């Protein structure tokens, strides 16, 4: 064991990945282990470890909701070389939970690291393109860092506030990634689209042109480790696969890979989508569940321009996305089938 730890230390140092049981987090853990990092999966006591079975993974339980407990948990381990913060929520029963869990708890985490003298070499924060909201909706220009954020979702606002907090901390070694829609094996929101296609129904929203972007989960992981390798700090990067797609491209690829002979295509006007979204959210709240279709999802589907400028990531990190949508959907559907999801 001592030799193994020394090997890991020499290979890359120690890395803590919060939200490790989640979609992006579990792939980051796998890649960290593969690269020889001393890999720590930050999880809740109740988190599933289904995708964290490698015996080389160490676990650290973190209670972000209790700052005093969190400080004891962090002190018990000591400083990590790198922290990749994936923990957070993408849908909630109460929209106020976005503020509490994505913003305030992340700020408490950062404050604890600073107060305990546990600041890592890099603190990598997984944010979202949604922090900018609907920008260049008429011109369809790529969203870039010089644009003014105007998020119209509770999720986007919570992530933006955390970005702004990081940027105010003098000398804090943050790196921010703002991926567009991330898809791949283990992801459940895009999986709902596959389920709909399996039922021979494809639903789109709005009648005006919509430019969509996507990024396969492995390319997000690639970007994170490129940032670690380059040692960059106090930078923010957009991530996509570099391509722009129409609103039908994803569903067309699903139809092809799933071998569906026919599909009914429905295009809802935005006002109808809004009504359906609010009703779905209301019904889910009555059942004390978080609905995938909600007012945040309505604003996401309403947005027409999802182009973003990945140039800085390409130039500064050497980011080179390896998966376009064609390849990514093929691998994703294959995984769904192999794992009994389809």
Predicted segment positions?
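Amphipathic terminal alpha-helices
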Residues: 308-316, 320-342
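Catalytic helix-loop patch of NAD(P)-dependent Rossmann-fold dehydrogenases
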Residues: 136-181, 202-206
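N-terminal Rossmann NAD(P)H-binding glycine-rich loop of SDR-like oxidoreductase domains
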Residues: 15-35
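Mid/C-terminal beta-alpha module of Rossmann-like enzyme folds, strongest
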Residues: 227-292, 310, 326, 330-331
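Flexible, glycine-rich beta-alpha linker
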Residues: 132, 175-192
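Conserved Rossmann-fold NAD(P)-dependent oxidoreductase catalytic core, especially the SDR/UDP-sugar
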Residues: 107-154
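NAD(P)H-binding glycine-rich loop region in Rossmannoid oxidoreductase-like domains
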Residues: 58-104, 108, 134
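Substrate-positioning beta->alpha
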Residues: 157, 161, 187-192, 205-228, ...
